[in-house]
Amino acid sequence: MTEHPVVNGERRTVFGKKVKRLRRLGRTPGVIAGPVVPEPIPVAVDEREFERAFHHVGTARLVDLVVDGTTYPVFIREVALHPVTREILNVEFYAPDLARPVTVTVPVLTVGELAPDVVGVVTIQTPELEIRALPDAVPEHIEVDLSLLSTERTVIHAGEIPLPVGVELETDPDVVVVVVEEAEEAEAAEEATRVLAEEIGDRPRSAEEGAAPVKERKLRESE
């Protein structure tokens, strides 16, 4: 079995506004849900261990959450941040059935270099792909090799990207993932993306204490 980052914690008995005291003690409140737990388990986890694990695997890989001596392989499904201080307020963990595939969204990572005769700017039009795999087989990212591009081939579609063994593509295979564009077109696309990101960032979001959920994982168990 793949080795996972470890985060230690304990069952939480403090709720509501009282969880502020937990944070002052270096504990981050959260909850474990999923098919392997009969009912949601409120937890408090070590703040520094969680932050290290989150920065290392994000929402793309499993973390071993050890609660009172019991280990739960979990995905970090949602992290709520304070809208001003960006302090982590609450975490939702998802404990999957390791024997059943899950459908998740993972980021795209470009590797390799363009051939010298390919002129233009590489744009990632689809930064994430939806895939299906067993929880322990979910890759941290999907690599897209830029050396496959040429003067005749300026686009890479989702269905053309090689996937690791045991991983199936759920995204439409005809979706454009990477494209070589002229500089002016790339700048216009980048500006449109920036404006959209600012508009999304300005939208009000409801969560604990006005928190803004980040990195909400598109994750579900496959039928």
From Swiss-Prot:
Q: Which UniProt keywords apply?
A: Ribonucleoprotein, Ribosomal protein, RNA-binding, rRNA-binding
Assembly mode = Part of the 50S ribosomal subunit; part of the 5S rRNA/L5/L18/L25 subcomplex. Contacts the 5S rRNA. Binds to the 5S rRNA independently of L5 and L18.
Q: What is this protein called?
A: Large ribosomal subunit protein bL25
Q: Which Pfam families match?
A: Ribosomal_L25p (PF01386), Ribosomal_TL5_C (PF14693)
UniProt xrefs under SUPFAM superfamilies: Ribosomal protein L25-like (SSF50715)
- Organism, as annotated: Thermomicrobium roseum (strain ATCC 27502 / DSM 5159 / P-2)
The segment annotated Disordered runs over 198-223
InterPro entries for this protein: Rbsml_bL25/Gln-tRNA_synth_N (IPR020056), Ribosomal_bL25/Gln-tRNA_synth (IPR011035), Ribosomal_bL25_b-dom (IPR020057), Ribosomal_bL25_C (IPR037121), Ribosomal_bL25_long (IPR001021), Ribosomal_L25_dom (IPR029751), Ribosomal_uL5_bac-type (IPR020930)
Give the gene name. rplY
Assigned GO CC terms: cytosolic large ribosomal subunit
Q: Which HAMAP family match?
A: Ribosomal_bL25_CTC
Under the GO molecular function aspect, what terms does this record hold?
A: 5S rRNA binding; structural constituent of ribosome
Q: Which family does it belong to?
A: Belongs to the bacterial ribosomal protein bL25 family. CTC subfamily.
Which PANTHER family did the record assign? RIBOSOMAL PROTEIN L25/GLN-TRNA SYNTHETASE, ANTI-CODON-BINDING DOMAIN-CONTAINING PROTEIN, RIBOSOMAL PROTEIN L25_GLN-TRNA SYNTHETASE, ANTI-CODON-BINDING DOMAIN-CONTAINING PROTEIN
Functional description taken from the UniProt entry? This is one of the proteins that binds to the 5S RNA in the ribosome where it forms part of the central protuberance.
Query: A GO term (biological process) for this protein?
Result: translation
